[in-house]
Amino acid sequence: MSEGLTGVVLAHTEVAEAFVAAVEAIAGSDHGLVAVSNEGCDRAALTARLDAAVAARPAVVFADLPGGSCAFSAAAYARTHPHVRVVTGVNLAMLLDFVFHRDLDPAAAAARAAETGRGSVTVVGGAAA
């Protein structure tokens, strides 16, 4: 992996930490991901946590739910930080794709990760319709 973009996994309770731990178990510790939880904070505190995680670097924020507080906070943050892109509906496949393509610019990395994430969602098993 390479130096490059920061990925911020922004999620409810311990979900962000679990995603980052899973990526580390699969891809190693040089992943560029930071876990941020919304637990116990209001919107201002969540924005402060996000700002500390991004630390003025080019970044992609991966939020858990498209319509949740994490996604709303990330979208508001990105509107005032042009070097930040937001992807919602985070899954492990998109995070793994991101960590191996941190050399891209935020827009390209976000688009690639979102496409990988969408493509990884399948229905397996059961009777054919």
Annotated model-derived regions:
Residues M1-A129:
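N-terminal loops that bind phosphate or other acidic moieties
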